[in-house]
C-alpha cells in the first residue's frame, strides 16, 4: 500500500497536499497538533480544517495529533507504516517571527529539530521514500530586497533580464545578509535536508 505522510497536515499547504493525494486514491497519514492555535490564538486554530479532512476522506486520511519534536511518537508512526511510506511532505513549522523572537528555543526546536526527527526516521525506516521539504523565502534573509524590480500594474516583478526572473532557487546566497530568528531556524532545517540528501541519498 502506498502511504503519503504529511506533517502540518491541517495547515494551508499541508491540507492541500492531503487533498491532492487523497483525491488520487492514496492513503495519507497526517501529523498536526494544531500549534497555530498555541502561537496565534483560538482564531488561528486549524481544528476545523483537520475535521473537514477527516469527514471528507474517511479512511483515506489518518490523522495523528503529535508534535514533530516527539521522537518516540514520530518513530512509532513511521514503524507502523514502515516501507509502505513512499513520500514525506514536511510542511509543519513554527511560522511566527514574533514568537521566534520571544521564544527562540521553541522556534528552533520545532523548525530544525522537528525536521531532523522526520529526516532520521525516513533514513532509518523508509530510506527509499521521497522527502519534500517546504521551506520559506526567509532563508534568503534580506538578499531578495536588492534584486532589480520593475513596477507592474498590480505588483513589482524581477526584471526579465535577471537570472531569477522565473523564480529564486538555491543558487541565491544565504550568507552575509540579515536574517530573522525564524529565518535562521528554517535555514538550519533547509541545510539539514540538503545534507541528508547528499549523505544518504
What are these regions (language model features)?
Residues 1-201:
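N-terminal Rossmann-like NAD(P)+-binding domain of SDR-like oxidoreductases, especially those catalyzing
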Amino acid at each position: 500500500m502506498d502511504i503519503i505522510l504529511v506533517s502540518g497536515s491541517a495547515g494551508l499547504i499541508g491540507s492541500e497536499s492531503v487533498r491532492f493525494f487523497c483525491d488520487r486514491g492514496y492513503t495519507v497519514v497526517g501529523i498536526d497538533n494544531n500549534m497555530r492555535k498555541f502561537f496565534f490564538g483560538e482564531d488561528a486554530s486549524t481544528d476545523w480544517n483537520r475535521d473537514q479532512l477527516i469527514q471528507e476522506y474517511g479512511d483515506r486520511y489518518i490523522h495523528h495529533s503529535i508534535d514533530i519534536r516527539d521522537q518516540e511518537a514520530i518513530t512509532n508512526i513511521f514503524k507502523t507504516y514502515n516501507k509502505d511510506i513512499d513520500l514525506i511532505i514536511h510542511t509543519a513549522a513554527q511560522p511566527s517571527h514574533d514568537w521566534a523572537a520571544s521564544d527562540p528555543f521553541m522556534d528552533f526546536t520545532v523548525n530544525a529539530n522537528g525536521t531532523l526527527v522526520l529526516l532520521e526516521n525516513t533514513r532509518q525506516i523508509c530510506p527509499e521514500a521521497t522527502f519534500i521539504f517546504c521551506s520559506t523565502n526567509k532563508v534568503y534573509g534580506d538578499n531578495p530586497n536588492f534584486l532589480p524590480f520593475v513596477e507592474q500594474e498590480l505588483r513589482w516583478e524581477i526584471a526579465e533580464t535577471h537570472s531569477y526572473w522565473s523564480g529564486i532557487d538555491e543558487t541565491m546566497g544565504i550568507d552575509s545578509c540579515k536574517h530573522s530568528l525564524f529565518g535562521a531556524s528554517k535555514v538550519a532545517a533547509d541545510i539539514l535536508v540538503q545534507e541528508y540528501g547528499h549523505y544518504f541519498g
